[in-house]
Amino acid sequence: MKKQLFKRKLLYASLLTAASVAAAPVQAEKAQPSNCQPIKNTEAIAEGTRVNKQALGKWKNKKIHKINITINNIFDESDPAENKWIYRLANRIQVNTRENTIRSQLLFKEGDEVDPERIEESLRRLYKKEYLLDVKLELAEQCGDLVTLDLIVRDAWTIEPRISAGHEGGESSSEFGLRDGNFLGSGAELELIYKTDAERSQVDYKYRSENFLNTRWLAEFYHADLSDGENNRVILEKPYYSNNTRWAYGFEVETLTQVDKIRMGDSLLNAYSHVTESQNAYLGRALAINSKRTYRLNVGVTAVDHAFSHVEQTQQLPDAEQQFYHWVEVQRQTNEFKTYTNLNYIKRAEDIAIGQEFSVRVGQGEWAETDSMTRLIAQYSNALALQGNHLFKFDTYTDLVYTNEDQSLANSIWGLSGKYHYYVDGKNRWQIRASWDRGNNLPEYRELTLGEEVGMRGYPLSYQRGDNRYIVNIERRFYSDIHWFNLIRVGAVAFVDAGRAWQTGNGEQADHLASAGLGLRLHSSKSGNPAVIHINLSAPLVKDEQLDDYLVSVAVGTEF
């Protein structure tokens, strides 16, 4: 009954929220001031930055008279290397980002006082948008105590015909379709894609906008037809869109039906139909804000149901699982960033949050039909930059469910990871990454697997599984100056991996695995999509008769 009431409330909330979304009102044109003079920008904007901070600081607390926005094409036709017919054609085909799309996302507006920190944050958030390659701000004109700002952005290529095939962990996959990450210049994502892999085929339909109708609302509508089920998701949210946002609220509803196939190596251990229904709604408030950090308090309610049924290969069904609980959450967000180049991408600036961040969510409610539970979901991370060429990142997480009837943990998992980057020089990097995960009373579909899908290169998908896992990756990376056709950046990597996954009490049956190999990395310099193509040749150093001497994989990753 509670779940039905909750679902109805979500429906009513969605209708009311959707009705409240409206475009920003049009402001009347202001009178032009007199005695205006251009501002001489004597110092160029430093590489890896988006504004001359020193020059901007001189205008702190002065009024912004006007903000001019210039949106440049993807290809720079003033550059002879890019002034070719194919690039000029691409510039004509691409629908440039609309000025209103950019203006509606700025954290400052005409008539505001110049706030350097807020302007820098706004530029950083704009740069993260998939449809922009570059963002710069210049001081253009002064009119007494008024200042005019020039915002200059460069569009990214966002129309992506998806015709691809990959081979990873001994399994093949393919995609065919079309995706536009900046539909008609609105900043919205629209996709229609057909996908196949070893488990299933599916057709994805998706619309997502982080500034729905040029407002601060995020909206996503997703549907997928699966060969073994379907997936539907709706998100409507007014998030914390800046460090200084005081209120946030929203909801998400998702249903997923698919056949889970439990594999270990070449063996199919079990299979069953799995239906997941999840609903989540929250309300949040920023408690304390300063230039270094922001604290927030969120409250919400979550309902999750897992149901299972037989298919032809079913050996044993997991127990059904129902959760319905209210929760409260405290968050700490760092507001300090450091910009790096040649980190996760090739020749592209990246803003890395420096300092401590955490979130702690505690909830109580129903577990199954007759039991109650306490749930703890927590995350902590800390990034530390030392001497300009050392970057450390530490993360830990926990997701615990304590059932009151059994007085024990159920379907719980926790772990920690660390990552170290050492900058040898402008083109060469060392990266060491290590992680450990531990589960307790995990159902099969949530067990920890080890194979190429989690970075254990040279081994098939889900080669080992259990409730314990560790993995260590050591990489020597090379970020070259090669720029094929002014489109594709090229990098290379040599790597060694080690790891193991095993079941508690049965560890002697799982070997410690190791592999070594070489790889190429290809990254588009004109696309805002963070995808990186991985081409790896890896050899397992610990193997059995089932494994080949080497494994060639071609896959798309989210970073180098």
Positions of predicted regions on the chain:
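Conserved GTPase G-domain substructure that encodes guanine base recognition and part of the catalytic core
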Residues: W414
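Immediate N-terminus of the mature polypeptide
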Residues: K2-L15, A23-Q407, Y420-F560
